[in-house]
Amino acid sequence: LQQQEEHGWYFNERAACELEQTLRREMEETVGILRSKYGFVSGALFTPKRNNRTQGYVQGCSFTKLKQLNPTSRDHIAWILKTHENWTPTKLTATGKPVVDETVLKDIGSETSLLFLKCLDITKKLGMISEGVNAWQKLSTTCNRIHHHCSVATNTFRCAHRKPNLAQVPSDERFRKLFQATPTKVLVSADLS
């Protein structure tokens, strides 16, 4: 494992950039569909204390401010599903908000929930490739190598991975082809669990 960390994994930067662009396009299309269907979500109730002609406020007349839909906001997703899809949450967080995760969105199974699920999935994948703290493109060296840490020094003697966690690479072939054998070498795999 020490040699693996020192040698690093060969990382196909060009394919990673192409995949990032593809994911960003998919995200834009999905966000566009959701925003065209549900443009805004309900914001806070506001009661002006005085008239404001430029803003159109009238003293004492309450109104609800609208916010543009953020398809990756769990609060916005819950509001859309409850308001437009008549969804009744079964699980709540400690603060009383509905739990909105991948499992819940799959269980709902509506077209809208699956679009929100796609947005969350793409966001997670973009975090792995380019946006996260331990994003692969950020940790790739000038030699196109990623030197991650893999250890069996856990209580259960299972592998622990970090900086980045390459054990969590999605099984999608588009992601697996980013990690290749060094040119002129052969990649041999083993299951360490």
Residue ranges: model-predicted function:
Residues 1-175, 180-186, 192-193:
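Conserved "right-hand" nucleotidyltransferase catalytic core of DNA-directed polymerases
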